[in-house]
Amino acid sequence: CSAWRKLALFDAGKLGLNGRILFLDLDLVILSAIDELFEGDAPFLMLENWYQPGNGQASLMRYDSDFAKPVLDEYLSDSETILKTYVTEQAFIAERLCVNGAYFDPSYCVSFKKHVMHSDWRRFTSKPYDKPEGAKVIVFHGRPNPPDAIKGDWGKSLPALKRWWKGLKPCPWIADYWRE
């Protein structure tokens, strides 16, 4: 799976990087200054999965350049076993690097689906919530992507009936922060 390619980020030397590294997926929306994401002593931080507390979410990770390389080396030495053991790369990364629940402050990084969309019948009748107070980043994990959310559409990859059933009203304020 292409998601496992994220592990290549842990070879900072090959990428010409050193020091503290912040990885952000391309489908994130930055709402305000992200300086706080660099603060603290933890050598590795990632998001906590909003739907599976205690599990990591790899859309945003911060790590010290020399800290994560052993995880890439482990994967390269026994990828067959690791692929059979872990459903996703983020489960593998979280288990190996997220020491003592080293997650970002949950108020900084929020989920579009969980914190902006309505989770009940209101998704059919009401516009999504306004920008979450204090949030620095909105994560768009899966569908919709930011351009689709702005229009109120789940994207063409979903069948029309499913797009209707999932319901999504336009969220135009995201356009203030999103640039293609």
Predicted regions and their residues:
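GT-A fold catalytic core of metal-dependent nucleotide-sugar glycosyltransferases
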Residues: S2-G56, R62-A68
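A short acidic, often aromatic-flanked loop/helix-cap motif at beta-alpha or helix-coil junctions
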Residues: C1-A3, P53, C109-H115
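Sterically constrained small-residue positions within well-ordered secondary structures
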Residues: C1, Y51-G54, K84, Y129-K131
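A glycosyltransferase accessory/donor-loop signature
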Residues: D66-E180
